[in-house]
Amino acid sequence: MNRPLLQNSRLLIALLLVQGIAAGVHGQKPGTLLWKLHHPVASSPAIGTDGTVYIGSFGGWVSTTINKRISNWKRSPPGKSGSSIFALDGKTGKKKWTFDLGGSEGLTPAIGSDGTVYVGPSGKSIFYALDGKTGAKKWEFKWNRGSRNRSMLPAIGGDGTVYIGTGFTVYALDGKTGSNKWEFNLGHQARSTLAIGIDGTVYIGA
């Protein structure tokens, strides 16, 4: 399952290959199903500041809202499928920019508080920070230890530190410069998505 998101006491879950589901958790009867959309989900959901929900699907992107199940728009990526990231207008679905990640497929990005997009391609030993408005590359981080990006999402700490899992190793990167703040060898293959506690503790299963 992809990473769930919690907003305004509502839990949004995108089930891989099945459907997108939002369920109320606090302030309502726990687990109450608000709505569901049937789409071939390929990524974790993301929620804009206006409540728009974005879900990557096999064959394109879908936009809806946290309160309704109505699809605002759908968009199919141009050309052949590959490792690219697309920035689409949240209201119309019009493409703003695209960036070629150079891998077999792109992983779900993380968005910083300043709009910076953090993402890497699956199967490659490289990670990017992109300008959220233009798609221009801010920095890249490479490693040469045989570990490659897997289907694990990057996580951003409260101080802007970006954490990535690369197989056997977790890296903490400066969100502004991409410099390596620290790294930790897990001793085992990472098997879960990174999570950051309110005290800054990093959690990952291996």
Annotate each PLM feature.
Residues 2-3, 18, 67:
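Intrinsically disordered, low-complexity regions
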Residues 12-20:
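Bacterial N-terminal signal peptides
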Residues 25-206:
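Extracytoplasmic/lumenal domain signature
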Residues 2-12:
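Bacterial N-terminal signal peptides that target proteins for export
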